[in-house]
């Protein structure tokens, strides 16, 4: 009688949410997936899908979430725009937490998948450049800052020029440094 009762779907969702609150993510993921598969199309299934999305974003596994959603035939799923946002937000969260290696990897995935033309291309390029800078991977940082410096009117253009100039000067590439210093004057 339990699986067919009118409160079973709600209980399954609540159990998944409890696991999530306890940070038992593997149990939460398993429970949410069971809720989605058992009660497909229900409000609880959609809530479980939202909770899964949040777990995968928080744990920097958004590609795994996207792959999972592609296996679901009977539910309205993510569009390319929401994939764009999910990958960006996941990388941004890693950046804000100071996890620059993970942020750089996430933003690089975003840039390769959605740019040019993605909603967050300029911001993703900026955060990628700063992540590489924080990791002291200066050649990769210069590459990203250069991409920013070439986009007229973006809010990061001056900072990108300054970073390129400073890094080039430190590398004794004085002509490049002078060029970017002059662009700012």
What name fits each language-model region?
Residues 1-185:
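Acidic, polar-rich low-complexity tracts and alpha-helical solenoid repeat scaffolds
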């Amino acid at each position: 009688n339990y699986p067919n009762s009118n409160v079973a779907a709600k209980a399954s969702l609540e159990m998944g949410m409890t696991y999530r609150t306890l940070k038992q993510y593997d149990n939460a993921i398993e429970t949410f997936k069971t809720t989605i598969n058992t009660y497909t199309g229900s409000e609880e299934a959609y809530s479980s899908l939202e909770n899964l999305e949040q777990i995968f974003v928080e744990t920097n596994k958004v590609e795994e979430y996207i792959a999972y959603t592609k296996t679901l035939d009977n539910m309205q799923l993510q569009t390319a725009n929401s994939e764009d946002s999910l990958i960006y937000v996941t990388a941004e969260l890693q950046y804000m937490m100071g996890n620059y290696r993970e942020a750089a990897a996430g933003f690089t995935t975003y840039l390769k998948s959605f740019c040019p033309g993605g909603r967050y291309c300029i911001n993703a390029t900026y955060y990628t450049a700063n992540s590489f800078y924080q990791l002291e991977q200066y050649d990769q940082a210069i590459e990203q800052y250069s991409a920013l410096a070439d986009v007229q009117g973006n809010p990061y253009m001056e900072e990108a020029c300054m970073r390129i100039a400073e890094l080039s000067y430190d590398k004794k590439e004085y002509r490049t440094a002078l060029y970017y210093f002059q662009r700012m004057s």
